[in-house]
Amino acid sequence: MLLTLALAAVAAPPTARDTVKITEWTVPWETSRPRDPYVDPTTNRIWFVGQAGNYVAYFVPGSAEFKRYELDAGVNPHNIIVDADGTPWYAGNRAGHIGKLDPATGKITKYPMPDPAARDPHTMMFDGKGGIWFSLQNANMVGHLNQKTGEVKLVKMTRPNARPYGLVVDETGQPWFCEFGTNRMATIDPKTYQLKEFDLPAEQARPRRMARTPDGIIWYGDYSRGFLGRLDPKTGAVTEWPMPSGARSLPYAMTMDDQNRIWFVETGVQPNLLVGFDPMTEKFFSKTPVLPSGAGTIRHMVYDKKTRSIWFGTDSNQLGKAVITPRGEMIP
């Protein structure tokens, strides 16, 4: 296994044009932990869940309108994704199911887990083939839901308390995910359901969220040590860069823009910092405080190509939008 430590490099911020412009809206339901926004491909509504408020909701950016759909007490939804038909699917994190919401009627269809131990659906992503891959952190599993039949298949991790967490799906429908309780990244063959794991060199490493660039490289934030990591699955080689805020950074939410730049949030500092890293230059090029709220903690975020924006929810009860400057328009 090859480990390369790279020197951190934070470029000077642009002087003639901001790299990032952040706007926040206060969610009208107090202390509800709005999180994991997802852009509806049919309406451009921003769907999100209230983990502490037991709801699914959407936000209309143009009118600043919020609409809420109630869930049963104790569901504590953790994540939401919206399919090509505009149907939201949520992870019932404390209720052992994945739910499908009909926005027109409010009707919810529940897909229960086949194993009572699979109690906490966590982070989900479509596979592009009529299914949803999802992690189950405390159940120590990763699952796949067939959206048409409702069949759920589960794969157990090899280590106890591996805690599969952040998850992405590649263009072939194959899931890749972090094992937050260990120093491992992993993937599952969608045809055989065979688990393959990759050890990270540092035993103390704890990858939490991740992204995957089109060249097949896996990027992760090491939450415990304060590093950005690059894993080449073909060779197992790992390169790491110290985060701008160092060991206290606690990198959490992560996404990738349409220029394959990596964005993540340092949650160990207040206000939280939205940081950009360019794999082309191997440099951190942007560092923006999440203001005015400070955010508390940003746990997950998504990039919307149409508006060149990153959407996120905050523990301080805001929904946020960060408009990103394209590489060619940045002025150093």
Feature map (PLM): residue ranges:
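A short helix->beta-strand "capping" segment at the edge of beta-propeller domains
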Residues: 14-31
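Beta-propeller fold detector
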Residues: 23-26, 67-72, 109-113, 153-157, ...
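Beta-rich, blade/repeat-based domains predominating
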Residues: 30-43, 73-85, 116-129, 159-172, ...
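Conserved beta-strand positions in repeat-built beta-propeller and related beta-rich domains
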Residues: 46-52, 88-94, 132-138, 175-181, ...
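A short loop-to-beta-strand structural motif that recurs across blades of beta-propeller domains
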Residues: 55-57, 96-100, 140-144, 184-187, ...
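Short loop/turn segments that connect beta-strands within beta-propeller blades
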Residues: 60-64, 102-106, 146-150, 189-193, ...
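Solenoidal tandem-repeat scaffolds enriched in leucines and small polar residues
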Residues: 124, 133-144, 152-155, 159-185
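Blade-level signature of beta-propeller repeat domains, shared across WD40, Kelch, NHL, RCC1
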Residues: 295-332
